[in-house]
Curated annotation (Swiss-Prot):
Membrane topology: Lipid-anchor
Composition bias, Basic and acidic residues: 114-123
Name used for this protein in its record: Lipoprotein LpqB
Lipid attachment points (N-palmitoyl cysteine): 30
Domain of life where this protein originates: Bacteria
Lipid-linked residues (S-diacylglycerol cysteine): 30
Species the sequence originates in: Streptomyces coelicolor (strain ATCC BAA-471 / A3(2) / M145)
Signal sequence segment: 1-29
GO CC, any one term: plasma membrane
Lineage, opening ranks: Bacteria, Bacillati, Actinomycetota, Actinomycetes, Kitasatosporales
């Protein structure tokens, strides 16, 4: 810690001195405190060891202003729960008004320091320093991450106390600031779960219209080693981020919070977590309580597999209890839905399939007209219940929808593009969890994002205020409230993530809008292909400016998840994944369908194109 400082800044080596006091190890400067083993100095590199906690020491007596600033920056990256050590570098008034949880600014190489030599004299009573760096990201008060760029320059002012003669900071930027590697070591991303407010998921069962609420992942960043389980529960109860707020709901009654005596939360030896709540939670009925427990269980299992059951209590009485087996009957998550088949177009231009997750290499035509070969196909999409499929003809001009049941006929195309060339016509389609079909028409004279209700009828033009560019690819998330678009502008293809809002009553023609489109890959100049690969994660094929094509994962907020990078593969034109992360990636490369089983290298499946999982 502390090595992540700007090169132009003044750098003093951290002092690492250990004192044993009543069995407690105190470290001067910054150091790591393992639960067992030897003390060691702290390097500013990503560390995944959950047993290591880092603490800073307060300012030493008569420390000069530069050391006070340096020590404060060091303390910001420690595991001090309430930043009490960092506050000791501030004046009394500044310590009271400083809100470290207000924001976090992440810099590429850490903050450098520039002294204001024109006005600084250590023999005077005030001193100014400018923190400098290059912005990478910000985390706001809701713990929501967003990529950022540009120059960072913020002033820090110090004053010398008239009585103690000690230098302290009396004016500083809001929140905390640190380098990227310190941020990766100190913070972790966790998906909180809420429910789509107006988009229940169509049940996979063939009988009955039962619809379950769709669970929606809302990623936030929490401090990795500062009681993350309790942090995450408090964060979930505080409500969704503003980006998702208009389209999700929480089942917790307004005002629900942890009970005052809740303390630190941890599961028992039976993997059950008991969550004591205040009296507001007692107003929920049995069904709502199950939904509350499901929100907690989905969220906590994203943090750790150690939680397999959640019990909610209020006023000393049990409200409800929910196990992971029963949680899937309360709400549906994309990551919990395992598709039956992988689909692609074979060398006879038919829609074919192979059992998902199998080692098989022999595909079979799907039942129904799209598997019979009467209509040659260029690209396809299969509904999430695997009962219907959509296909684009070879010239990208016509869209067909057919049943995956033997004996059916294909019928007329449901959509036609008037674009003059193949690249100016229809994109591959995508099905949402409600059974509706999405597609973009790339016709330069009339570019549109379209929705076909249940894959039929007149297409509804989706409003896209603020969209600057032409849509080249469409993928709707399993939760039904997020959409991923590859958008081309001025020769650059970017991945944008937006929020889907639907207006209108059941049975009416919906008014559909995609809002708050944000770049998830600002560093990539060319996005070739993408697919959803988790509740809040995508796999992306692309390249940086002047670089070579690569495959990687990205979170919906634009951050990089803690996941292994897929093995390299050249010439990738299409890629398929599923929200169930246990299933292999599948790609179209060099005229072949290939797959990547977990921990292995890419393997040839067979000849073909356009691989897709349902969705």
């Amino acid at each position: 810690m502390g090595a992540d400082r700007g090169r132009g800044g003044r750098r003093r080596p951290a002092r690492v001195v250990a004192y044993a006091v009543g069995g407690v190890v105190l470290l001067a400067g910054c150091a790591a405190m393992p639960d067992s083993g030897d003390l060691r100095g702290v390097e500013s590199t990503p560390r995944q060891d959950p047993q290591v906690r880092v603490f800073a020491m307060p300012p030493r007596e008569d420390a000069p202003p530069a050391d006070i600033v340096q020590g404060f920056l060091e303390a910001l990256t420690s595991d001090d729960p309430h930043y009490e050590t960092a506050r000791k570098y501030l004046t009394g008034d500044a310590a009271k008004s400083w809100r470290p949880d207000e924001s976090a600014t992440v810099l590429a190489g850490g903050p450098g320091t520039e002294s204001d030599h024109s006005g600084n004299r250590e023999d005077a009573n005030d001193y100014s320093v400018t923190l400098t760096g290059t912005r990478v990201a910000t985390v706001d008060a809701q713990q929501s991450y967003a990529p950022a760029d540009g120059v960072y320059r913020e002033s820090v002012h110090l004053t010398r106390d008239g009585k103690s003669k000690q230098w302290r900071i009396d004016s500083l930027p809001p929140g905390v600031v640190m380098g990227k590697s310190d941020f990766q070591r100190n913070y972790m991303s966790v998906n909180r779960y809420y429910f789509a407010s107006n988009t229940p998921v169509r049940a996979a069962a063939e009988t009955g219209p039962v619809r379950e609420p769709a669970a929606v992942a809302d990623p936030v960043y929490v401090r990795r080693r500062v009681d993350p389980m309790t942090q995450v529960v408090r964060s979930l109860l505080s409500g969704p981020t503003s980006l998702l707020g208009p389209v999700v709901r929480s089942s917790f009654p307004t005002g629900t919070a942890l009970a005052k005596n809740a303390g630190s939360l941890a599961p028992d030896d039976r993997s059950k977590l008991t969550v004591p709540l205040n009296d507001k939670a007692a107003r929920a009925g049995a069904d709502k309580c199950d939904e509350m427990a499901a929100q907690l269980l989905f969220t906590l299992q994203n943090l750790t597999p150690a939680v397999q059951e959640v019990e909610l209590r209020s006023g000393g009485e049990q409200l409800c209890s929910l196990s992971e087996d029963r949680a899937e009957t309360v709400a549906t998550r994309g990551s919990a839905q395992r598709p039956d088949y992988l689909y692609f177009v074979d060398d006879q231009d038919r829609l074919v399939r192979i059992a998902a997750g199998s080692n098989g290499t022999r595909a079979e035509p799907v039942p129904g007209p799209l598997g019979e070969g009467h209509q040659a196909l260029r690209s396809v999409a299969v509904s999430r219940d695997e009962h219907s499929a959509a296909g684009i003809g070879l010239d990208n001009k016509l869209l067909y929808v057919g049943s995956l049941v033997s004996g059916g006929s294909l019928g007329d195309p449901v959509l036609a593009s008037q674009g003059k060339t193949e690249s100016d016509r229809l994109t591959p389609p995508s099905w949402d969890a409600q059974g509706d079909l999405w597609i973009a028409d790339r016709n330069p004279a009339d570019p549109r994002l379209l929705l076909l209700k249940e894959g039929a009828g007149d297409p509804v033009e989706v409003r896209t205020p603020g969209l600057d560019g032409r849509v080249q690819a469409v993928r709707v998330a399993a939760d039904g409230v997020r959409i991923a678009l590859v958008v081309e502008k001025d020769g650059k293809r970017s991945l944008l993530i937006g929020r889907i809002e639907r207006d209108g009553k059941a049975g009416d023609v919906p008014a559909v809008t995609v809002l708050e489109l944000r770049s998830a890959t600002p560093e990539l100049e060319e996005v070739t292909a993408m697919s959803w690969a988790g509740d809040a994660r995508l796999v992306v094929v692309g390249r940086e400016r002047g670089g070579v094509q690569q495959i990687g994962y990205v979170q919906v907020d634009g951050s990089t998840p803690e996941a292994s990078v897929p093995a390299a593969l050249t010439g990738v034109k299409e890629i398929a994944a599923t929200e169930d992360e246990r299933l292999p990636l599948v790609a179209y490369s060099e005229d072949l369908i290939v797959r990547l089983p977990s921990g292995l290298q890419w393997q040839k499946v067979t000849e073909g194109t356009a691989p897709v999982y349902p969705g």
